[in-house]
Amino acid sequence: MPSLLIADDHPLFRAALRQAATDAVPDTTVAEADSLDGVLSALDTDPGIDLVLLDLHMPGNHGLAGLAAVRAQHPEVAVVVVSANDDPRVVRRALDHGAAGYLPKSSGLEELRDAVRAVLACEQWLPGSLRAAVARTQSSSTDTDLAARLASLSPQQFRVLTFVAQGLLNKQIADRLDVQERTVKAHLSAIFERLGVRNRTQAGVILRELELSDPARQLAD
């Protein structure tokens, strides 16, 4: 029985995704989260989740960092990015960072169903309206290299990197992870080496490079 996690901070959109998912695969079990912390907690708690429908912009996630976090900490889980942003360059970046599909929020219910069916069948999925444009969009060598470097981090190292990007000190990170401070320092040394950086500031910048502006918020402004 497939298991799916819907991650979006808008209840009405989560309800629409739930309906589409259960229509597409009737025996699917569906859980929900409204923040990136909720996503990672659900994945830690339930190792049986097969697919995450991940909003690019919700509490704790402002771009591709959430995708990178899920892929780094749970590489066995497929992720379909859900976003109001249908820029082919953003779609290409999401695919380069490990997304199994990309679903614009303007998609109809049938496209939602198609996406769920395809990705659960281990296929990559894009809406027909974006396929040609994305195919013409070249991957950025910088993005490809960044994705590879982030993928080289262990789940715990990625958590440490996330806290570093948030500006937390070693003691604070140790308290959050319930480990000793020297363990955090060891993780940082490994992170610096794998990312090819020299200090915390450079490491934090790498993760913040994955941030994207929110088109829905821009329209509201």
For each of these PLM feature ranges, what is it?
Residues 55-56, 83:
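Active-site residues of response regulator receiver
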Residues 190-221:
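Basic, Lys/Arg-enriched C-terminal extension of HTH/homeodomain DNA-binding domains
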Residues 167-202:
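Recognition helix of helix-turn-helix DNA-binding domains
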Residues 32-51:
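Acidic, metal-coordinating helix/loop segments flanking the phosphotransfer/catalytic sites
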Residues 35, 60-65:
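Acidic catalytic/metal-coordinating carboxylates
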Residues 64-76, 206:
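Short amphipathic alpha-helix used as the core "switch/output" element in two-component signaling
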Residues 91-96, 105-151, 155, 209-212:
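Short, flexible helix-to-coil linker/hinge segments that flank and couple to helix-turn-helix
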